[in-house]
Amino acid sequence: MPSLPTPEKKGKLSRLRIFCRYRLQFQAISSASAFFLAGGLKLGWSVLERPTVNSQKLIATHLLTIAWFVGVAAGSVLASAFVQRVSKNLAHYLSGVFLVLGGILFICAPTTFASLLCSCLLEGCAYGINQIQGIVTAGEVAHKHIRGLLVSSERIFLWLGICLQLLCTRLWFSMEPDNGYALHVNQLHGFVVILIALAALVLNITYHFESPLLLQMQQRDLAATYVMKCLQGAPYPCLEIVQKREECKQLVEYDAGQTVWMVMRKSNALPLLKLLLLRCYGTISLSLPVNRTFITASVTGLKCTINCVYLLAICGVFGSILGALCVDKYGRRNIAVISLLFSGTCAFLMGGILHYIYEQISTILLTHLTFELVVYLMFCYQIFVCAGVSMASSVYMSEAFTVAMKAKCLAAVVVCEQALQITLALILFYVDFNEPLFFFFIGVVGMVMGILALFFLPETMCMSLYESLVKFNKVPS
């Protein structure tokens, strides 16, 4: 079915006017953004910090490190069963309940292994559910000119949560009085998680806008039209609303009447493979090996006496915001290609410098300067990955799949992400990890993927969801 013509605007709206006109679209994902923030807090606690537990067994720390990833994978599989079938309220209320329970466990037993493990699993499950629902909702409610900015809330608020956790922990220990605090640091974490969960539930109740596509699938045409009018900032029926309604019908009819296998093979298999590779490369920047390498380099290079990973998290926030501002202006493919090439180059250089350090450590006179160079290269690597690879992959995830298979394909991508994170963590724990070889490998992979992305990734900037879907199933021009 051919795409409908796009009505042209008489004048280009400024960014401020775009925020004002489409403010309800940002409000529609405010609850999901709060859950992403809570997920960042837990990811920062479990991976970028050393989990605090009263058990002396090393296996306890290892399990706490990977538990959140297991929970995210389980939550995404659970979400694939009901997302785009029922109201988004179910996902948000489930996520809220899981977060509150996880926070209570942290408050009641802040150093007990079983309590902390259950909390990580519950909060990971909450994030997994919300990640699938949030990406689907953001893609469906967003105007095509701001879809990238709207979907980018996933990465921005995840990194903000990580940054908040690391900065709060640093301040907590740097300002600790001689007689200590009445609260344990894990209890503070639990209180913050509960507050964010309650805020997310309040936002969901206050700004409840269902996806017009879901309403159309449920044959609630009047409700769908009303929601479209609100979200598009149109006080009366206009060509833009008519076009949006017809686009929803096209998306619903695209894979109607086909078997799951046929839909998967015909329209979703190739986009799924592309996004798996892109997303897994992007998730390495949050992995335990990258974190541990930065800690080692920063202790020597920056003379850090306390965990300085918050500096890496600030780079993640900066890169994510930069990517969000560029993705709808310069295109998804362009920033993905550039960031893959530059991040791959930075990783390759880090591998070379680390190899030189470990081979010639006895002859290097200024070791701290060499490690300092590794730190700065890692800052650049983090910014490039967050601004381009992670951002573009998030936006592509909202555009690449058909309606019937979107939640399942997103769950497959998320599960593979978490499997990669767990694998890298276990390798670091139980294998003689070769840091130079690791960075050499991801450097080569990044540069090769950058070249391939130029030819095999479509450019979907300023396209409707239906146009993006069609574009993804053709060789890009």
Where in this protein do the model-derived segments appear?
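Cytosolic juxtamembrane N-terminal segment immediately preceding the first transmembrane helix
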Residues: 1-55
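Loop-to-transmembrane helix entry/capping segments in MFS-fold secondary transporters
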Residues: 58, 144-153, 302-303, 403-412
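Flexible cytoplasmic loops linking transmembrane helices in multi-pass membrane transporters
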Residues: 2-25, 186, 233-298, 477
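Central mid-sequence intracellular linker of multi-pass
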Residues: 179-251, 443-476
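Glycine-rich segments within core transmembrane alpha-helices of 12-TM secondary carriers
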Residues: 146-199, 411-424
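C-terminal transmembrane bundle
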Residues: 35, 65-80, 93-95, 104-106, ...
